[in-house]
Structures are given as structure tokens and as C-alpha cells.
């Protein structure tokens, strides 16, 4: 069986000791804070929901910023993690929450990795939404800050992963329409067969990555396909399946 495996990155211990007061101020409207900061540390990460709740109860929550359709975000981790995996995991988590990346403002990878973007979402981007969607990709928010016009999120990234679809050998595995690319864990498979349920629309665009998200193959077609097979390298880990037209469903069958 091809198993859905989270990529556990066992690198340096997370060294950022987040400041609860800085986190509270980062989410506040700038007034004098009159909230308790007790019990906001949950298993080594910030209890974002409780902090937001306390700020709202005390009328300190920055509702104006977080109801705006755009927000400058900077994701920071002091752990030594592959930058491609860090960025891709964040981007896919945001996409899953219907948050668009309008612009990449910065990307640095030294003693710490930081990824700055202009994020867009109708109705606003609030801390609870960010916490929920990032947690699904294995991130923990350790704290917040305000840095050079950005809302900075300090992340524990040691358990980050791509949310890849689970597939079985020699069985059709329907993929639920995602609104974006389909991500399939193909580890252990020698080939991937993709069948489109929309025979008059799908034009294949498939990228193959290794476990560190280095692209090792690209398949791009200019004609409509209904059945498409790709031979996979031994180190293939992920297949990102895209298309140039709208499709209702794709099925894949690793062999």
C-alpha cells in the first residue's frame, strides 16, 4: 500500500521563545491591554483562539486589520528546514483556506527562514483562520509580532507536511475536487495512471517532486487526454496534478 506519510523534519530544536505580551500586542488595536496572559501556552505553542477571545472581550482586538481583504504576512521559523517545503506547505495551506498570495515580498533562508507575502481574502484574514489552516499542514504558531508592516507568525515547523491524497496500489482512487492542484503521495509506485472524468476538457500538466520538493520531472501536454500514464523515478514522492481547463474529477491508479 502507498501510505500517506507526514514528513517529520528532525532538525534543530525550536529556539524562539515567544513573548505572550508581544503576541497580544500584535493582535490588538493599539489600546492599553487589560487582559490576562495566563494559560495561553498550550503544549509549547500559543493558544490562538483563547488569546483572540480575550482580546475581543476586552475590546482590544484589531478587528479593522483582520477584516481587511489584504494583509501582509511574514512566516518565520528558526528551524533548519528545506525552504521549498516550507514555502509550498504554507502556500497550499493558505490555498485550502481560499487565501490568495498576491505577491511575494521576501524569502530569506539563513539562521532562520522567513517568507513574506501579501495575502488576499474577501472578508478578511483572522488569526484563528491562520492557526486552523496552518495546523492542518503540521505547523504550530508559537507567537505573533508586528515587523515592518507585517503580521509576523513564528512557527514550529518540525512536523510540517504536504496534505497529499492517500492512494492504493492497483486500485482507482477518486480525488475530490480541490479548487487547485491535486497532490498525490506516489512514494513506492513505479507509474501513475490518471483518468479524467471530463474527456473533452483535461490537458495534462503534472509535476513530480522528491521528498524535499525538488522537482524531478515535468509532464506538459498541449492536447486533451482522457487516460495518461507517467513512469516514476525511484525517489518520486509527490505528484502535483493540474490542468488548463476545468475538470470535475480525476482518478489515479498507481501500479
Specify the residue positions occupied by each region the protein language model found.
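Non-cytosolic beta-sheet module surface loops
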Residues: 195-199
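Noncatalytic modules at the cell exterior or secretory-pathway interfaces
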Residues: 113-117, 123-140, 189-193, 231-252
